[in-house]
Design a protein with these regions (language model features):
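N-terminal start-of-chain detector that recognizes signal peptides
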Residues: 2-3, 21-22, 39, 46-48, ...
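Conserved hydrophobic/aromatic pocket- or pore-lining residues that grip, position, or stack substrates
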Residues: 10, 30, 48, 75, ...
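Glycine-rich hexapeptide-repeat left-handed beta-helix
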Residues: 52-53, 59, 64-225
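Extended, small-residue-rich solenoid/repeat segments and analogous flexible loops
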Residues: 1-40
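Hydrophobic beta-strand core residues of beta-sandwich domains
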Residues: 4-6, 26, 44, 94, ...
Length: 226
């Protein structure tokens, strides 16, 4: 009622839900924990959770099976990815099986308010996005360590592991390991082991299809890791 839609098993406890800017939808068994402040529109997927004190600005879509905390503005986080702790994420899109460490933050607006450029796989260079607000785009199975800072319009590929003090470069190639001090190749076998361990925590595993996709991405993106 009043723009809030709860599916079976969904619950919101001791939180502020404001639907004057858009509807709020909670899928089956989704949860909004105590102290959250949510401005619609929000779609919270099945078995997803907003952790204590989370602040959400629409338009945002999360899940299924995502845990989200901190401050989130105009983002899409696809299934089984987590941003479970404090930190800002704005105007961003995360693929499946990503994890942002505690206090990961991203910039979504340049200090000079200029149009954002971002890495284009089509042109193999940085290209204008036509956007003044543009945050982080992160591929499946990528991770950030605690206190990671992403600059405006950063593109992170598939199965990358980003960590370290300072701002990493605005384009992190798939299957890279490192941060501001430089990156090295994240070997395919190790990346697959990490993916399998993460998926098994959710009762899943890297099957032949997933393995084939990741191997194909690994081979196709080799030129960007040189």
């Amino acid at each position: 009622e009043d723009g809030v839609f709860l599916e079976e098993g969904a619950r919101a406890t001791a939180s502020i839900l404001n639907t004057t800017t858009g509807p709020i939808y909670l899928a089956k068994d989704a949860e909004i924990m105590e102290g959250c402040i949510v401005r619609g529109g929000l779609a919270l997927g099945e078995h997803s959770a907003l952790k204590l004190g989370t602040k959400i600005y629409g338009a945002t879509t999360l899940g299924p099976h995502c845990k989200v905390g901190g401050e989130v503005n105009n983002c899409v986080i696809i299934g089984y990815s987590n941003k479970g702790h404090d930190g800002f994420l704005g105007n961003s899109a995360l693929g499946e099986w990503c994890n942002l460490g505690a206090d990961t933050n991203n910039s979504n607006l340049k200090n000079n308010y200029d149009e954002v450029k971002a890495w284009s796989y089509v042109h193999k260079r940085f290209s204008k996005t036509g956007q003044q607000f543009c945050g982080l785009v992160m591929g499946d199975h990528s991770k950030s360590g605690i206190n990671t800072m992403f600059n405006t319009g950063t593109v992170v590929g598939v199965s990358a592991n980003v960590y370290g003090a300072g701002f990493p470069r605005n384009f992190i190639a798939s299957f890279s390991w490192g941060g501001p001090q430089g990156t090295m190749e994240y070997k395919l076998d190790k990346a697959l082991d990490t993916a399998d361990r993460m998926m098994k925590r959710r009762g899943l595993e890297v099957d032949d299809v997933e393995r084939g996709i990741l191997q194909s991405v690994y081979e196709q993106t080799a030129e960007f890791r040189r």
